[in-house]
């Protein structure tokens, strides 16, 4: 694990730094080190936030998957912008990401969907995510119906189930320090294809 005293503020590569921190989190966090708070806004500008799981990242951005007809899916498709916040309590570190959002390719979505447990793929069909549910029995009945429907062979990916990629224009790294004199480093760029600028911030 990276030593807590290492001066991450010298880094000039935000994605490499994020990869190092995520590796540390996987060794330190007991549950879901890839969990991240995802913030969106509705058409009136009212924020929504919920936890999702980061499934991939590279120099292009941060990828997660969802139902496009869910609340988060609709808000992202409308605003085409979102923010993320990773917080690893055991490491006393935080990473904030803001940027434009795009859909992943069908090939990416198909590959990830195929890697999911069979029950999760059935669930993608059975759950009308974010819509009113009359009872637990109604959900379990839908699961049973789709389990029977796809009892043999592959389970296709629903057209409404896919992924998003946040293409960041800002990534901020935060590390807790004594007396609230924390270290903060902000990387920004004018557009998802631009060069990164870096600055330290007061805590």
Swiss-Prot record:
Keywords associated with the record: Flavoprotein, FMN, Oxidoreductase, Pyridoxine biosynthesis
- Keyword Oxidoreductase present in the record's keywords: the answer is yes
Where are the bilayer-spanning segments?
none
Q: Name one GO molecular function term.
A: FMN binding
Its EC number is 1.4.3.5
Identify the metabolic or biological route this protein is part of. Cofactor metabolism; pyridoxal 5'-phosphate salvage; pyridoxal 5'-phosphate from pyridoxamine 5'-phosphate: step 1/1; Cofactor metabolism; pyridoxal 5'-phosphate salvage; pyridoxal 5'-phosphate from pyridoxine 5'-phosphate: step 1/1
Question: What is catalyzed by this enzyme?
Answer: pyridoxamine 5'-phosphate + O2 + H2O = pyridoxal 5'-phosphate + H2O2 + NH4(+); pyridoxine 5'-phosphate + O2 = pyridoxal 5'-phosphate + H2O2
**UniProt binding sites for substrate:** 55, 112, 116, 120, 180-182
The cofactors named for this UniProt entry are: FMN
UniProt: FMN binding residues: 50-55, 65-66, 72, 94, 129-130, 174, 184
Which GO BP terms sit in this record? pyridoxine biosynthetic process
What Pfam families does this protein map onto? Answer: PNP_phzG_C (PF10590), PNPOx_N (PF01243)
Superkingdom of the source species: Bacteria
Q: Gene3D superfamilies of this UniProt entry?
A: Electron Transport, Fmn-binding Protein, Chain A
- Cofactor: record remark: Binds 1 FMN per subunit.
Task performed by this protein: Catalyzes the oxidation of either pyridoxine 5'-phosphate (PNP) or pyridoxamine 5'-phosphate (PMP) into pyridoxal 5'-phosphate (PLP).
Which PANTHER family would you find in this protein's record? PYRIDOXINE-5'-PHOSPHATE OXIDASE, PYRIDOXINE-5-PHOSPHATE OXIDASE
Q: Which family does it belong to?
A: Belongs to the pyridoxamine 5'-phosphate oxidase family.
Question: Quaternary state and partners of this protein?
Answer: Homodimer.
The protein here is known as Pyridoxine/pyridoxamine 5'-phosphate oxidase
